């Protein structure tokens, strides 16, 4: 990415976070960025211009939104939270309800565990947060999910942007059948970054952030599937954070790993919380106690209890919670 465009893009991203609902501010920003697009070097990649234009389009859509109350922008959204969920219900195949009246607030820069028996709705819930469930046919949901104060189902934030800012690491190891380098670079190019130097710098930083760089720096063109299980999972995390998300969703990220690899992933997760909010589905109560700050207990598609991990495991308020953590449920 050209230096000038990179600066414009960086500045716009920074300003985007501060955008309020006032019409005058939207119009002012639209004018500024239209001018910047007009002044870009003619050789600039069309994809890069499109990135800026898409942000302008978002602002223009906001002007058309007459109702800027809680249906779109939550006026009383607590800045300490990253998500606020109100009355969330979810169905598979139109009539099989798996989530019931979920009301939650998830704090920023904390590691929050979702615990509960298999089939209780944890994985379905976590996929609601970046609308991955919406990629499936025959699903529906209602209620409101506010991400940094914005209703994710109102059109104020498009799905691709949401999934970039709310990254996902899955239970199964999912490296692409590419080289180690291309596993990260591919996503960067897909998001309009084409400058080779910039890509190399981002790849290196992502691998360093996941403590993988020193292990693979001399073999970046090796196929990612030849890595060990722990290395593959760290690569998947590096791939997710290369796009600088606000949130990392993790669905049982260590369930397929041995104890040594699990320890390295847990250490990495604790380090990453300084920059990212992490929401993790886990069946390991020992892991929950070791690495998480907050815990949410699900049962039969409902939230039974939410609190600090220490409180949940030492002073649970609900009998059902106590039965579960003591192994009697």
From Swiss-Prot:
Principal subcellular localisation of the protein: membrane
Membrane topology: Peripheral membrane protein
Cited Pfam families: ABC_tran
Function: Part of the ABC transporter complex PstSACB involved in phosphate import. Responsible for energy coupling to the transport system.
Coiled-coil segments: none
Keyword terms: ATP-binding, Cell membrane, Membrane, Nucleotide-binding, Phosphate transport, Translocase, Transport
BP GO annotations: phosphate ion transmembrane transport
Key word Ligase present: no
Binding site for ATP: 116-123
Protein localization: Cell membrane
Catalytic activity: phosphate(out) + ATP + H2O = ADP + 2 phosphate(in) + H(+)
Protein origin, superkingdom: Bacteria
Gene Ontology molecular-function annotations: ATP binding; ATP hydrolysis activity; ATPase-coupled phosphate ion transmembrane transporter activity
Protein name stated in the entry: Phosphate import ATP-binding protein PstB
């Amino acid at each position: 990415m050209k230096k000038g465009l990179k600066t414009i893009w960086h500045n716009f991203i920074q300003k985007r976070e501060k955008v309020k609902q006032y019409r005058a501010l939207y119009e002012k920003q639209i004018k500024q960025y239209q001018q910047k697009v007009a002044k870009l070097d003619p050789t600039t990649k069309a994809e890069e211009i499109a990135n800026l234009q898409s942000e302008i389009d978002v602002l223009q859509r906001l002007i058309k939104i007459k109702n800027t109350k809680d249906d779109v922008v939550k006026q009383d959204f607590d800045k300490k939270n990253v998500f606020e969920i109100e009355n969330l219900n979810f169905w598979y195949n139109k009539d099989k309800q798996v989530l019931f009246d979920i009301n939650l607030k998830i704090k920023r820069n904390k590691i929050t565990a979702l615990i509960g028996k298999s089939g209780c709705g944890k994985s379905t819930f976590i996929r609601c947060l970046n609308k991955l469930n919406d990629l499936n046919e025959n699903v529906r949901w209602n209620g409101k999910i506010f991400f940094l104060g914005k209703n994710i189902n109102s059109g104020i934030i498009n799905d691709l942007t949401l999934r970039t800012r709310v990254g996902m690491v899955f239970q199964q190891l999912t490296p692409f059948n590419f080289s180690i380098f291309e596993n990260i670079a591919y996503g960067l190019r897909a998001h309009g970054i084409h400058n080779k130097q910039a890509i190399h710098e981002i790849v290196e930083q992502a691998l360093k952030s996941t403590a993988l760089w020193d292990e693979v720096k001399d073999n970046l063109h090796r196929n990612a599937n030849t890595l060990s299980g722990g290395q593959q999972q760290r690569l998947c995390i590096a791939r997710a954070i290369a796009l600088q998300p606000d949130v990392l969703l993790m669905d049982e990220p260590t369930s397929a790993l041995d104890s040594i690899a699990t320890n390295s992933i847990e250490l990495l997760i604790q380090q990453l919380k300084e920059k990212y909010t992490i929401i993790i589905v886990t069946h390991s109560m020992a892991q929950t106690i070791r690495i998480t700050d907050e815990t949410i207990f699900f049962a039969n598609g409902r939230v039974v209890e939410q609190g600090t991990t220490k409180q949940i495991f030492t002073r649970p308020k609900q009998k059902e919670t106590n039965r579960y953590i003591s192994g009697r449920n």
